[in-house]
Amino acid sequence: MSSEEFKGLPIKRDISSTIYADRPPALSAPPCVGATGNDKIQVLPIPKKSRTIKTDKPRPFLCHICTRGFVRQEHLKRHQRAHTNEKPFLCVFCGRCFARRDLVLRHQHKLHSALVSKESINSKDKTEIDAINDKNIIQIQGNKQTILPTPSNPLAKTAVQLKKAAKEKKNGKQGKLDLSPSYGANNHSTDVSPSVGNSSTPAVIEETDSSSHFPLPDTNIPTKSKRHASFSASSAFTYSSDNFQKLHQQAKSDFDELQESIPHQVGFSTPQLTAQQLIENAIESGVVDLETLDLPPFLSLDGLPPASSSAAVAASEQIDICPSSATDTISGANSTPNQAATAPPFQLPIARESSSLFLANTPYLSDFLTMGSSYGGSGGFAKSITADPSLDYFNYKNHSHPDSRHNNSSSGINYSNNKNNNESIEKSQNNSNVINETIDHTDIHAHHADAHDDSFIESEEWLSKFIMDSQIDNDLKLNINHFNDIGFNNLHPQNPTTHSEPRNMHNENRDMHRSASKFQSVSENISPREQMSLFKTKQNKAISKFLSDEKIPSTASPSSSASPVQFDKKNVDINEFLLDESVSNLFTTRQIDLFKKNVNLYSPLFQNQKDAVSSTSLTPSLTTQTATTQSGPGWTDSSQKLTFFTEQLRNLIIKENNLKSNLFPTVDELNHYVDLYQVEFHKYFPFIHLYSIIPSSENYPLVISISMIGALYGFHSTHALLLSKIARTRVRMFLENTRSNHDKTPIWLMQSLVLLTFTSIFSNDMNAFRTVNTQIMILVQLIKISKLNYPLENFIKPPIESDHVLEYQDNPAVLNQFKAQYNTREQINRNFKYFILAQSRIRICHIVLLISNLFKSLVDFDCCFHSIDLKCGVPCYNEVLFFCENSRTWNENLTRFNIVLDSKFSLIEVSNGESNYEKCLMYLSNGNPYLYKNAKISFKTLLSLLISIHEKINIERDALKDSYESDFHAKNVQWRMHSRPLVATMLKHWELLYIKNGGILALSDENLPIINTNPSFRLIIPLYFFAKLRKCLDIAPTLRCIWNQDWNSMNSSLEKVCYERESLREATEYAVSVITFWIDTVSVMKGKSTQTPIFTITCIFVSILVIAGYMRRLEDFAQNKNSDCMIGSLKSTDRILWLKAFKTLKRIESHLSEREYKLQTFAEFLRVPDNGSLDIESLDSSLIENTLNSHDVTNQALDIITRTRLSSRTLYCGARILGDTPVWPVSLLFAHALQSRAIYNINHRKSVNSV
């Protein structure tokens, strides 16, 4: 066998030649563990795993007892103490002895945190820290005792003996108490019987576990104590008593004696070690590498880090994030003062400034090695076993924007630990109305957690910002004559040519130009005193400070917010931006057409349709519920009718908000809006369990918000504006009244804020858009403060007993009684409520993750809820479980899916979606198939993962923006070399998981019906192509200008985006796929294009801009080619892509031409004649295809590219697509942007006739 073949084989050590030959002569032999009477050294055998050399690194320092080699001499010295049992470091407070200095520091900061000086925490000098710590440590060379006398414990009593003495002193048996030390000079302990029972003990006992009663060894026979089998067998700290090392000093020490330390009724295949021995052996054997593990600082051999270090800051921010589900073993009735030392780390009364905060929520290293239970939670683990480096891909803290400095201020916020914790949680559940009745506190109780004084850090600031933004649109103006008109609320000004100054988010001090309109304000119809209750807020110091720092410009009527924007006249002809009502009329005509269809569909009892859509009559009452529902694999709608509004509730809303009855929708209209919400919106974003809502005087902002969304789908945007104002005002007042109690914010309030955020993001009102950043920020803060992003089992015990199979396996009758309890109506009802509550919490977090990161992707505002902050589960795989209207239907579906709830763990698993989102992120980063080898993931979870990829794009863009702010080319190179491959890898991992779970990416005639019946597909596919588009181009600056209605900046930004041709070509491929997906889906839906979700509409708008930019580059190239023969020929990829876009646009024009209403012409859209352009509808597709598919580019092909003007045609088709789905007001803003861009292209292009 050659030498090459020997590579990688384990090398066996010749023991006989290395025991003495390799021993350094300078090493003196310390006493051996196995010393006998004749002082002959007994060499212990080398463990089997230690015989193999695992590294080529030289290890010159050898142990003369076991021949182990070490790289450093201090490692050898530490190892030798394992043989000699030397404990030279003494704790001055209690006398406990330790083998290492850092173990003493850990012990003191854990058990004597109140006695340790705080100077070491505040000091930055390492030498000063060491000097302070040395004051509390006594070093005694050669000591082998476990405990020595100290001033506080002069007799060197162990904790068990002290407990025994305290108990007998209480019972009046002081005379019989032996006051001798624990161990005499002959190293034998005195005969003291163990203490039994749960009696109270004095507060002087600080160290031992009150539940662990260690009997002392007999005076003559060195026996070992036994631990009860009910104690945890996974923690190495409970394997033996304090005098474990005495075994090594017995002449007849062998394996049988070592087994005596093992608790009875628990068997182990190998002898158990103490925590110190376990940690040392693991490190020395190479099983654990402390450098690669993300361990807490207290396990470091170099001592604790200073308080100013990053490790100390990181540890202080992670206080109380560990679940407290393992704390139910400590009850208030049987608690003793000794439990301060025996409680889990997260229950210790730790001061925040103390160095012992490193121990809070930090699992023991021994638990890490033994799969211990320090983590707690469901199944023993509620957080990752290790800090997986894959999650670093989503670490946003290093690249955060300045406005995100408050996003994590509540990471250390905790629940209040008081005696009324159960009642407060029940009250929160009642307020949320997620469940119909209070969950019985005897079955579901809250687990206690620690409270800190700084629970609401800087909460006043973000709350005041939200209140301040609420005043922006205080003067709500409605046109009474057009209150019930169909269409957007800003299409009826009497002076449509009025224009407003463009306002940027960074130039908010610029005054708006007020339009001269004759709108009548709602505030004019009520008294000044009544106006205060709806539109004014109580001023405080924080609000006054904000108002003084930044003046809020007064707002005009809603018509001015969406009016055409006026620009500076420098180098720009202002007439090209004077957009008339041609685009607005397109939307109004389409809305009236759709409303007429809805009249025939929803209510045959409607009166004259002409009166319903006229500008002077009121909309008739709607009396019939929506009858059509759509069902599919991911969507199931119940037939139960939802009636949230009654006359009593409507009168209450009118009275509390000081409105007039004729300026508020009727009960039938409000309930009709709820139906529209359920049919059109809820199936795309199901984060509210509608059947659990019980409207009341407190939570009616939620049903108002629901009807607000439905009003948009009913084309009554004026109603939606009024309802949003009422809901926003009531939410703001609720937050003001509960300023000091935000940790108990009800779920219905967060759900209302989510719906309000939807309307603010996708509104064409500048004032509403300005409040989005604050609304998302307050949502994120409330989620973190109320710990909504953590699993529910951390705070509420599942209302189900365990199966007791092991306990009653020999008693089938009792076991059957337990199993029968799982199928009772009461138990099923409790399980259903717990499931709905858990899923509602999870879905709120996922929807906030969705809308906040999409908003960040569009306008580049850093106010998002980040993926790594989502510590809870995922939406359930079987969506129908969340749509069930009652517990009976829910239980039937559980049976249909073969889901059995026979323990709290099974209920927790179902409620958390059978996974957690951190595991999903790990798969997204490394693509490890083991994580999801056989698991099923819901499409809602896959949608959240896709949004996390968008978040990763945002993180990478922000990082490059900070590093290469002024160097565009360097930033582009770094993106292509580092960031883009990482994003592409994540997309590949996501694609594999999506396809494996039945997802569809390739469209065909066979799978189009499946896509249309599953709402998740209609969200996922456009966002998938949008992520690929963003991988190529950074379009966020352009979209930010559009939302600010700054058309000049928009055009300038688009010129920069379309600068690099290769990236633009690839992005255009994905943009064409988005448009093709839309035309494929709507062409088979028979005109039901109103079901196009708003996220898809946004992706369509961005795709239109990209396609138009690419077509303009080709048209400019074709013109330059005709005039300059030196320019290279047009590539075949460009010709294929142009032809693909041409066919898609022709399909769109053909589809939209079938509408029953007359649309504006192409010339009307451009506002100027486009001389020389060709009508694509009259062109022969086969002729164009033959011309462009020729081997050489002819002048005829270039002329076709130039004269078809697909750049302008694309913008025109985009405006017609937006007009075909006129639900959200932002569609009108998008259409104005497309018209502006089309006019800009015409005015900045050479005339075709001049070519």
UniProtKB/Swiss-Prot annotation:
Q: What is a GO molecular function of this protein? A: DNA-binding transcription factor activity, RNA polymerase II-specific
Which Pfam families does the entry link to? zf-C2H2
Q: Name one GO biological process term.
A: acetate biosynthetic process
Q: Does this entry carry the keyword Phosphoprotein? A: yes
Q: Where is the composition biased (Basic residues)?
A: 164-173
Polar residues bias locations: 183-202
Which residues does this entry mark as bearing Phosphoserine? S527, S603
Disordered as annotated region, ranges: 160-227, 398-428, 617-636
A single GO CC term for this protein reads: nucleus
Task: Write out the biased-composition intervals (Low complexity).
Answer: 407-428, 617-634
SMART domains assigned: ZnF_C2H2
Which InterPro entries did the record assign?
VerF-like, Znf_C2H2_sf, Znf_C2H2_type
Family statement drawn from the similarity comment of this UniProt entry: Belongs to the RSF2/TDA9 family.
This molecule's function is given as: DNA-binding protein that acts probably as a transcription factor.
Identify this protein by name: Probable transcription factor TDA9
Q: Tell me the classification of the organism that encodes this protein.
A: Eukaryota, Fungi, Dikarya, Ascomycota, Saccharomycotina
